[in-house]
Amino acid sequence: VFHIAGETPCDEPLILSSRPIFDMPKDFLAGTLPEYDVVVIGSGLAGMTSANILGRAGHRVLLLEQHYKLGGLATWFKRPGSHTFDISLHGFPYGMIKSCKRYWNDAITSNIVQLKNIRFDNPMFSLMTTYNREDFTKLLTSQFGVSEETVVRFFDTARGMNFYDDQSMTTRELFEKFFPGREDIVRLLMEPITYANGSTLEDPAITYGIVFSNFMAKGVFIYEGGTDDLVTKMQAELTKNGVDTRIRCDVSKILVGPKGVRGVVVNGKEIRCKAVISNSNLRSTIFQMVGPEHFDAKFVEDAQEVRLNNSSTQVYMAMKPEVEIPESTGDLLFCSTAPAFRTDLLLDRNITSRTFSFYYPRTRPHGKQRHAIVSSTNANWSDWADLNEEEYEASKQDLIETTLDALEKYVPNCRDKIELVEAATPRTFHHYTKHLAGASFGTKFEGLAVSRSLPQQIHGLYHAGSVGIIMSGWLGAINYGVIVSNEVDQMLCRSMSSPSPAIQAQ
């Protein structure tokens, strides 16, 4: 097996072909139509959801993915020994059940189950929780000594937040209003959300309130069966609804004419369309695929000010066949040796805080009964981008060793119990997704307004990706895909008296 130097190897062995060298390479666009109603660029959850809704409504939809499989960051890789690792299957709110039922199918919805053992361990406190409003209310009143009235007001305030609220209050100010001087409570409330979407105490409070309240509704959920099963079922649903899905198809240009979007260039081939939904990075959509010359000067200025969110590192650990991890270890473990919650410490290359995701056999009940652990940390692109190969490999090995050191507290003698370990860095995320700076959470809050205003700049151009923190994560991505697909349907059906009946029914 050969792999790209410095990167986590992909799950496709690169084998010398037995075909004659004069064979033509496969045409991944063979059989495509010359024109579609909609081209969706990128098959992350937002892209796939948009494509599925529009295909179900009867529109001609072409879904283009540059990678060799669908899913975006909702992905996985396999290793010998029946090991399958999920990249980002680490918990989402209950709302995912409702969204999948309405916009996908019951086969997907029925596999969503709750994680009931969310564990915190740091110098300030150590506890286990079901991570919902009822349990957090008990914790805040009994263990942290906050009055029930204050807790109720805090939860009600967070739950009542929406995009149209005052955006000047920061998350830090929100916490100080209800829990002044309580860094331990800030840590309890903020640390998991920072891991979930890269948000900080300096971001607008509404970005925290909306995401936190989604989780507090009924807790943390996961897809039982693994990301590979989820994406396989989504791909089958896309096919059922007439979506033309193509992998290994890299869009280099979105074509713009006097009246708006007119097509895309993919693998060197021009395909016409009436609308484009980009599920790619917002900045690369604007500045690379379209080009700044097609936008108003003020819009370009605003787009240039959009900050990318941080990246991530992960360490994947497969246990030996005979090893079992007690379920009392937890499903998600937020552990830290840092004395207090600090965003910069969560990003620092000298890692003090990690999330361990424990995968028990029930995660993939139909596969071999194997245990696995994935460690995730937030990371800065700058700490990895400019390392030479020797430095890069040494830094990856250090990441692995320090992760095993941290795991030892929770899984004693872990090195003897693990048969395979690999690491991914911001460079890995960049390599496989093409996200600028390896961003694993899209953009900061200001990216949402820029993303939403694309159709006002260029008729037929839309974006449905991870932006503004609110639209990050599995649920945020799916819901943004829903919002954008409805707008595209309305645009396509403007000459009709009403939107497509299938969309209207949703």
Predicted regions, residues:
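Mid-domain catalytic core of redox enzymes
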Residues: 10-19, 252-367
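A glycine-rich dinucleotide-binding beta-alpha-beta segment and adjacent secondary-structure elements
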Residues: 187-196, 412-471
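Extreme N-terminal leader/targeting segments of oxidoreductases
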Residues: 1-38, 56-57, 448, 499-506
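A conserved FAD-binding loop/helix module that cradles the flavin
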Residues: 466-488
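Helical element adjacent to the flavin cofactor pocket in flavoenzyme catalytic cores
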Residues: 212-262
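Rossmann-like flavin
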Residues: 123-205
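C-terminal segments that line or cap access tunnels to active or ligand-binding sites in enzymes
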Residues: 321-427
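N-terminal glycine-rich phosphate/pyrophosphate-binding loop and immediately adjacent elements
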Residues: 22-146
